[in-house]
Amino acid sequence: MVPGEYKLQPDKVPYNVGYDDISLKVKNVGDRPVQVGSEYHFYEANEQGLQFDRSQAWGKHLDIPAGTAIRLEAGEERTVKLIDFGGKRRVFGFNNKVNGWLDVDKKADTYNGYPLEKSYPEEK
């Protein structure tokens, strides 16, 4: 083996298996390129530059391999595939639009049936 050499298996490695995906048309209406990473909460991605149905993107990220990104040049329009976040479905940071549970029913003030005024469910 040569230093720095990669030895890859011939078969494709599956990723994001078992997640339902949606297709969403996205347009960069800005004057500069925009990149969005694989695990970025797509709902919160560049509000000024990217135009798409944000309600469809709530709780979802790009269906691309971890550590990669997509780039949309100024004026470019394309269709992307999005999948749900897994795990405990909590999102923090990004553009600070969520900073908590993704599945909170704001009208009912509950999280999966737990009243928010009491506390979040115990972590297991």
From Swiss-Prot:
It is an enzyme of class 3 (hydrolase). Heterotrimer of UreA (gamma), UreB (beta) and UreC (alpha) subunits. Three heterotrimers associate to form the active enzyme. One of its GO terms (biological process) is urea catabolic process. It comes from the Bacteria. The lineage of its organism: Bacteria, Bacillati, Bacillota, Bacilli, Lactobacillales. It catalyses: urea + 2 H2O + H(+) = hydrogencarbonate + 2 NH4(+). Its EC number is 3.5.1.5. Pfam families: Urease_beta. This is Urease subunit beta. It comes from Limosilactobacillus fermentum (Lactobacillus fermentum). One of its GO terms (cellular component) is urease complex. SUPFAM superfamilies: Urease, beta-subunit (SSF51278). The gene is ureB.
